[in-house]
Amino acid sequence: MKLGLSALLFPKASVEEVIKFSAKLGAECVEIIYDVPHFQPDYDQRKLSGIKELLDAHGLGVSVHGSFWDLNPASHHRELQKLTLTQVRRSIDACRTLGGEIVVLHFGRCPVPYAKDFLEEAKRRYRRFIEKCLPYARERGVTLALENAIGQPTTYPSTVEELKQLVLELEGAKVAFDIGHAHLAERRAGMNDTGLAIANDIKDLRGHLVHAHVHDNRGKNDDHLPPGDGDINFKPVVDALRAINYRGLLIAELWNPEHPLETGRKGMKKLRDLFKTS
């Protein structure tokens, strides 16, 4: 397992600075978010070769989080869905150029989930969207990893069960497991100590889970705290990842734009403490 940081932590920095900061903080890899503020929609991808050289110079592995701000793969607006597809394909191209293997894709959103027919159509739109992305990624040697949501009815897939069913049905689709999101989903489902439930989710995704986001929260908001600053019981989670012989990247996906270096340093230390091998 390689331990790393997400560019989410550094919204005020350039992508080049994100890479340098991550290396300085002891990361072994970095997750680039192919979206604003680091990449404008019309970003000239010829510049990616310089970013690749910088990653190589620091010996960092890389993954890419596909574009998602202001976008929605399940949108009922055709033009928005078309734009989302364009930007996700550009994310896949960026991943290939940077030498990465994983592109993380966000869930779809349905604004009126209580209208059942509308929700079902949003689910179909999301599925068709992924079906369009998969061959594009496959041709470029990139794996699409679908991220679990926080258990809200406005998202699809909203539960780990829905996510697993989706990747079983879509050949080539894999899972990016977000531990903080799983904690929120289990809390919404009525669980108090969510550690064992999250561990069971991980074991249930054996063979599908290829990427992981690690962050903490207090069960109410998606705070993106360093592990230990919230109330997630990480021990069974770590044990479960070891039990399935997880070998992918572990990305600390943290948020503190006012003090990113301090938070990143703390997050990397917590990752090493949790996942260090004897």
Regions found by a protein language model. Name each.
Residues 1-2, 12, 16-23, 101, ...:
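Histidine-acidic metal/acid-base catalytic patches
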Residues 9-11, 34-36, 68-70, 107-111, ...:
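Active-site-proximal loop/turn and secondary-structure-junction residues that shape catalytic pockets
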Residues 46-59, 129-136, 200-204, 236-240:
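Catalytic-core regions built around general acid/base machinery
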